[in-house]
From Swiss-Prot:
Protein name: NADPH-dependent 7-cyano-7-deazaguanine reductase
This enzyme's EC code(s): 1.7.1.13
Keyword line: Cytoplasm, NADP, Oxidoreductase, Queuosine biosynthesis
Species of provenance: Coxiella burnetii (strain Dugway 5J108-111)
Enzyme class label: oxidoreductase
Statement: the UniProt record of this protein carries the keyword Nucleotidyltransferase: no
Binding partners and assembly: Homodimer.
A GO MF label: preQ1 synthase activity
Active-site feature positions: 185 (thioimide intermediate), 192 (proton donor)
Residues the entry annotates as binding NADPH: 89-90, 253-254
Region listing for Disordered, in residue ranges: 255-278
Annotated catalysed reactions: 7-aminomethyl-7-carbaguanine + 2 NADP(+) = 7-cyano-7-deazaguanine + 2 NADPH + 3 H(+)
Length: 278
């Protein structure tokens, strides 16, 4: 069954929404990662050829204490890339809203409930953190590397084309980034805007051609997580780096932003540095 068929049958995307009045964990819609990975010719009977996570920031998160007083927080959810499933975004939004009128002893009880529900849906332990005070908010940052967007290029390709990628014989270690990433929701067609950062060691990637490749996603319809895995696999196969990390930070929609990270490095650390567009 294709990802699109699963979504059309089960997702609330593109449908009139009735917001839940009470706690509703059944709203969470898990989608098998294998559905997309098969289209990338990834052997789904083996562990994926990368490590990483999907980091979600939730900006519209609230619940009641036992006296009925509302509390609010920013939520941080880290789903391992090795999990069998991802969570469809609108179902996640509705699930979070189902906490609005529920009473809990404290924030820890809320986060533990969410951790249990999410981990059950994706078949792996999900990390849940709450940011409760302004002093805990990470500052915006700019990647330490070369901005590709300043390059003067001509392009008329707006669907992913890995043949745009090219390398030289020189071996380098460098970080490249762009704020021109745009793809689209495969169900609603809504645009997904983001910034992408690529760090690698290997044959030097032609910067202009890489920018063209990034822009080629402009009319592509695929989820955030799937786009980043396509980026990773295309660069890995066509440019043959010894080390590769690809991460994207998407702007928020419906109170959520999604930030997938994929790497050849198994010892990565989770970083939640918000881009200036977030």
């Amino acid at each position: 069954m294709s990802t699109l068929r699963v979504l059309h049958e089960k997702s609330e995307l593109g449908k009139t929404t009735v917001y839940p009045k009470e706690y509703a964990p059944h709203l969470l819609l898990p989608i098998p990662r294998d559905l997309n990975r098969k289209t990338l010719n990834v052997n789904v009977s083996e562990p994926p050829p990368f490590y990483g996570y999907d980091l979600w920031n939730a900006y519209e998160l609230s619940w009641l204490n036992e006296k009925g007083k509302p509390f609010a927080a920013r939520g941080e959810f880290i789903i391992p890339a090795t999990s069998s499933h991802l969570i469809e975004s609108k179902s996640f939004k509705l699930y979070l809203n189902s906490f609005n009128n529920e009473r809990f002893a404290d924030a820890a009880a809320v986060s533990q409930t969410m951790k249990r529900d999410l981990s059950k849906r994706v078949n792996e332990s999900v990390t849940v953190n709450f940011i409760l005070h302004e002093t805990e908010i990470p500052v915006a940052y700019s990647p330490k590397g070369s901005l590709l967007d300043v390059l003067d290029i001509a392009i008329d390709t707006y669907s992913p084309d890995p043949n745009l990628l090219s390398t030289s014989q020189e071996t380098v270690t460098e970080t490249l980034y762009s704020h021109l990433l745009k793809s689209n929701c495969p169900v609603t067609g809504q645009p997904d805007w983001g910034s992408i950062e690529i760090h690698y060691t290997g044959p030097k990637i032609d910067h202009a051609q890489l920018l063209k490749y990034i822009i080629s996603y402009r009319n592509h319809e695929e989820f955030h997580e799937a786009c980043v895995e396509r980026f990773f696999m295309d660069i890995l196969r066509h440019c043959r780096p010894q080390e590769l990390t690809v991460q994207a930070r998407y702007t928020r929609r419906g109170g959520l932003d999604i930030n997938p990270y994929r790497s050849t490095n198994p010892t990565f650390s989770v970083q939640n540095h918000r881009s200036f567009r977030q």
